[in-house]
A protein has these predicted regions:
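Short, well-ordered beta-strand segments in beta-rich or mixed alpha/beta enzyme
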Residues: 53-55, 74-79, 93, 107, ...
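Short acidic-glycine-tyrosine-enriched beta hairpin
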Residues: 82-104
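Ligand-binding loop in jelly-roll beta-barrel domains
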Residues: 101-126
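Conserved short histidine dyad/triad with adjacent acidic residue
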Residues: 34, 38-41, 46-66, 91, ...
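Conserved catalytic motifs of the protein kinase core domain
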Residues: 48, 70, 112
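A short, N-terminal "cap"/entry segment at the start of jelly-roll beta-barrel domains
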Residues: 1-47, 131-150
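Glycine- and acidic-residue-biased ligand/ion/polar-headgroup-sensing regions
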Residues: 57, 66-84
Length: 150
């Protein structure tokens, strides 16, 4: 596995266990205003990722598709489906939601929030100009087409 964890250290005698200290990490901007991330685990080859996500009040994750199963645990705030088949679905603190491969929606955080999100491969974000990108604004097919998962 080619996974990395920024600022992680191997623990004791087990070099295969990695401790991550998110409090020591800086929030990284995503390509979406008001959406921030701390990558707890990221495999640049497969796209496998676990991210601590922070959303400013009113932040929107635009139209996107979950290429594989996505899992989210809400620590604070609310995650609301703004558009899509589950429009109005609200996930609050202490709640967990997982979404099936191929599910597509627009999400927002009316009051902001902090969540842990787990991805098997990055989501596809659909832009009005026809572009399809990952969360960092990279062309999805160029960045993740090699995974064969989308």
């Amino acid at each position: 596995m080619d996974a990395v964890t920024p600022k992680a250290t191997a623990v004791g005698i087990d070099e295969h266990s990695h401790v991550v200290r998110p409090a020591e990490m800086e929030w990284q901007k995503t390509s979406f205003p008001g959406c921030w991330a701390k990558p707890l685990l990221f495999d640049a080859k497969s796209g496998l990722a676990t991210m601590l996500m922070k959303f400013d009040p009113g932040a929107v994750l635009p139209d996107h598709e979950h290429v594989q199963i996505e899992q989210t645990y809400v620590i604070s705030g609310k995650l609301v489906d703004k558009e899509g088949p589950a429009e109005g679905l609200t996930v609050g603190p202490g709640e967990y939601v997982w979404r099936e491969p191929g599910s597509r929606h627009v999400a927002w955080t009316p009051e902001g929030g902090i969540m842990i999100a787990m991805f098997q491969v990055p989501n596809k974000f659909f832009h009005e100009d026809g572009k399809v990108t990952d969360q960092n604004g990279r062309d999805w097919r160029e960045a993740w087409g090699h995974t064969g998962k989308g």
